[in-house]
């Protein structure tokens, strides 16, 4: 692979810590939505305009994310993400006006667009090559584990200090972690274009041959290779309804049916721990059972979790609240699906490009769910809104299975 084991491990640790500190901030904010609503004195629909702005920006920038990653490299994208995440955390903690809340979410949109999982996939692919799936799964799992610990600590700290002070401390920590990990642990990461130019001087012909040796297709080629990529992008759009729906609305769902806000925050911490262990094994599970079976497990698991939450809301049987949120954690694979599934469905020839397209599809869905689901809640109530999430999971599963069944890589492997 061209890198020592120590260098690969160091890079993976750096990526993990940056992801946990930068993208984890969004998870922490989701866990304290009831506190933020009280602090800003706004209703849920108005509050969700902020995250909607963030996801609109995320979608718009994800569409050009691969270009940005190519120009300034995945490592620097992640450093930008750390800085923006810190600013977001500080502004959310001190926001008492709706304008500050919107500005904070604009910054968060930049973070989510290209500075988290899309950039992380680019870094991991450089260091791990054909083992990218396993490495990415471990990185995602460890990231989720760290975020879960962070959320658990947050739920405890909220008892002894106001969230405004807590978020200021978090903002400083995110910058420190981001700078250290990007500059020291991850170190130098070659740009993709520079890497191609660095092919042996026997030159363009040898470089082209090396490119052709990579199995798979470019994003442009997949658009002409049948319906698989379209099914895949639709599935990524729909899965955002499930993933963003549960993480953004679970805490207010719980409190709307009588649960204390601090207990609701602890439940999201439990979700994060469950997600962490699932993500940790994701690459190995995918290699063992394949994309088709894994898709079924992800979406049926989530749907079963929603059913448990629905029953809990009517019976107040606390174990169902716990089982439900744990099963819902299967949907936490959502943002990792492009990084995990792309090699099997479309190969490694344009891993970063197709990965970025999948992330863009996800944020296109997230644009609609944050504001759309709040409207559904306003008209139908929390119970029926969560029924919609369960249905969305089953529809998403159908599209993802169609993407797997029509994958162009199946034909390529058949020819071999």
Predicted regions and their residues:
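Extracytoplasmic
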Residues: 10-44, 61, 65, 151, ...
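Extracytoplasmic gate region of multi-pass secondary transporters
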Residues: 29-36, 222-280
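Conserved MFS/SLC helix-loop-helix module at the cytosolic interface between two early adjacent transmembrane helices
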Residues: 60-98
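Helix-to-loop junctions at the C-terminal end of transmembrane segments
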Residues: 61-73, 279-290, 377
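Cytoplasmic helix-loop-helix junction between adjacent transmembrane helices
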Residues: 106-141, 347
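Helix-loop-helix hairpin linking two adjacent transmembrane segments in secondary transporters
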Residues: 139-190
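C-terminal transmembrane helical hairpin of 12-TM major facilitator-type secondary transporters
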Residues: 290-341
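A late C-terminal transmembrane helix in Major Facilitator Superfamily
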Residues: 331, 345-380
């Amino acid at each position: 692979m061209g890198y020592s084991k120590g260098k690969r491990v160091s890079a993976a640790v750096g990526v993990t810590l940056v992801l946990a500190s930068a993208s984890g901030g969004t998870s922490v904010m989701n866990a304290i939505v009831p506190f933020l609503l009280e602090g800003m004195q706004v209703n849920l629909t108005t509050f969700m305009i902020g995250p909607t702005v963030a996801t609109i920006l995320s979608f718009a920038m994800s569409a050009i994310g691969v270009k940005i990653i190519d120009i300034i490299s995945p490592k620097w994208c992640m450093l930008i993400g750390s800085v923006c995440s810190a600013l977001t955390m500080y502004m959310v903690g001190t926001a008492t006006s709706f304008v500050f809340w919107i500005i904070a979410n604009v910054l968060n949109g930049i973070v989510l667009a290209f500075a988290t999982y899309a950039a992380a996939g680019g870094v991991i692919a450089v260091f791990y090559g054909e083992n990218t799936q396993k490495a990415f799964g471990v990185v995602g799992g460890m990231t989720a584990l760290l975020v879960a610990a962070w959320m658990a600590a947050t739920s405890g700290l909220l008892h002894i200090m106001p969230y405004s002070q807590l978020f200021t401390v978090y903002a400083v920590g995110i910058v420190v972690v981001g700078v250290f990990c990007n500059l020291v642990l991850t170190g130098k990461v070659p740009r993709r274009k520079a890497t191609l130019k660095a092919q042996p001087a026997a030159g363009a012909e040898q470089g082209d041959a090396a490119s052709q040796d990579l199995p798979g297709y470019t994003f442009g080629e997949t658009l002409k290779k049948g319906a698989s990529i379209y099914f895949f992008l639709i599935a990524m759009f729909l899965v955002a309804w499930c993933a963003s729906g549960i993480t953004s609305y679970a805490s207010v769902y719980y409190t709307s049916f009588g649960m204390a806000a601090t207990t609701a925050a602890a439940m999201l911490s439990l979700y994060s721990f469950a997600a962490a262990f699932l993500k940790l094994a994701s690459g190995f599970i995918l290699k063992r059972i394949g994309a088709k079976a894994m898709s079924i497990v992800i979406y049926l698991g989530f749907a079963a979790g929603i059913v448990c939450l629905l029953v809990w809301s009517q019976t107040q049987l606390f174990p169902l609240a716990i089982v439900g949120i744990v099963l819902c954690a299967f949907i936490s694979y959502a943002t990792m699906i492009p990084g995990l599934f792309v090699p099997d469905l479309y190969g490694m020839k344009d891993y970063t490009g197709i990965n970025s397209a999948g992330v863009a599809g996800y944020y296109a869905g997230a644009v609609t769910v944050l504001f759309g689901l709040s409207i559904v809640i306003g008209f139908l109530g929390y119970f029926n809104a969560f029924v919609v999430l369960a249905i969305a999971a089953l529809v998403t599963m159908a599209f993802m299975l169609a993407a797997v069944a029509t994958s162009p890589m199946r034909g390529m492997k058949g020819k071999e």
